[in-house]
């Protein structure tokens, strides 16, 4: 069960969903990440099946979002600091300190083993110039953040955005760990708080396939990019890698899942992404594919 699918299923029932998420949030321990993720997934599955008991109920919610759904700034990850208790703020800060080193260690180990080639390609295309103004869409767990930040030069500056306050704190922890310049901002990708033509490069590591309304996000990314800038993205190879778990609750076939994702405007594959970028005036400048993901760079045509 993943945020982007939950935000579609419950977009018109936010208060009920937020109440559940806030209750669940108080139970999670940031120092028991694997254990808590399993518990979170199990409890989320139970909640979804309780609120949406049948496949037809699920399809009805898909149809409602297809007709009327739109990006909203208050979502299931409504963890901006104004909506957090003091205890949750303290917990988020502690988590940042813990996660900064943890994410750095994970990235260092991954680069030393299975992830070296595609991470090196990604970072090489993000950090091309002598003074980069970097904008990362979707900080998430911080793997892509740490991959870039560890290689930043003295005059580079990093800005990361995520709708989740906890993920923003991941970026803060990583920046502190590597002693690099930058900040994390909790805001929506659908309406970025930046002027036009602000950043020299926009990047995202396994972030787009966790987002909904991707065309809106890409349009905003293009708006804040300088005329000679680049957009560099890492995306998963496996179709519906994360989304499939939600559809599996109701026994959807792959064909049914594909059709639902098309109707609700979720990211699907490289060809679809490149078509959207072409509509925005971008051409593919570089491409690399590994067993688990692909990396693509786009530049203005």
Q: Positions of the model-derived regions?
A:
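Core SAM-dependent methyltransferase catalytic element
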Residues: 280-301
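Conserved alpha-helix/loop element of class I SAM-dependent methyltransferases that forms part
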Residues: 111-132, 147
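A conserved beta-strand element that flanks and buttresses the S-adenosyl-L-methionine
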Residues: 203
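Class I SAM-dependent methyltransferase SAM/SAH-binding core
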Residues: 135-191
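Conserved class I S-adenosyl-L-methionine
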Residues: 232-255
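Class I SAM-dependent methyltransferase Rossmann-like catalytic core
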Residues: 82, 87-117
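A short glycine-rich, Lys/Arg-flanked "PGG" loop and its adjoining helix->strand segment in the class I
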Residues: 215-230
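Acceptor-substrate binding/catalytic loop of class I
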Residues: 255-271
């Amino acid at each position: 069960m993943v945020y982007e699918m939950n935000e579609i299923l419950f977009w018109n029932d936010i208060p009920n969903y937020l109440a559940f998420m806030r209750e669940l949030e108080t139970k999670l321990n940031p120092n028991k990440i694997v254990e808590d993720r399993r518990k979170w997934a199990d409890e989320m599955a139970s909640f979804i099946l309780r609120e949406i008991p049948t496949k037809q109920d699920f399809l009805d919610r898909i149809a409602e979002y297809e007709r009327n759904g739109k990006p909203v700034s208050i979502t299931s990850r409504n963890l901006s600091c104004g909506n957090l208790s003091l205890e949750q703020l303290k917990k988020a800060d502690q988590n940042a300190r813990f996660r900064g080193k943890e994410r750095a260690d994970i990235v260092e180990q991954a680069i030393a083993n299975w992830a070296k080639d595609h991470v090196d390609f990604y970072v090489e295309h993000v950090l091309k110039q002598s003074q980069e103004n970097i904008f990362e869409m979707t900080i998430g767990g911080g793997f892509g953040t740490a991959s870039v930040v560890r290689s930043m030069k003295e005059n580079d500056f990093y800005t990361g955005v995520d709708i989740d306050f906890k993920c923003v704190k991941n970026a803060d922890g990583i920046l502190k760990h590597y002693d690099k310049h930058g900040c994390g901002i909790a805001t929506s990708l659908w309406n970025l708080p930046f002027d036009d033509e602000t950043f020299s490069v926009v990047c995202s590591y396994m972030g787009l396939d966790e987002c909904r309304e991707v065309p809106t996000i890409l349009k905003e990314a293009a708006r804040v990019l300088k005329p000679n800038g680049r957009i560099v993205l890492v995306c998963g190879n496996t179709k519906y890698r994360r989304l499939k778990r939600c559809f599996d609750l109701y026994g959807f076939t792959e064909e049914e899942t594909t059709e639902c994702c098309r109707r609700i405007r979720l990211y699907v594959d490289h060809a679809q992404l490149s078509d959207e970028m072409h509509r925005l005036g971008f051409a593919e400048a570089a491409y690399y594919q590994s067993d688990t993901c692909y990396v693509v760079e786009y530049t203005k045509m």
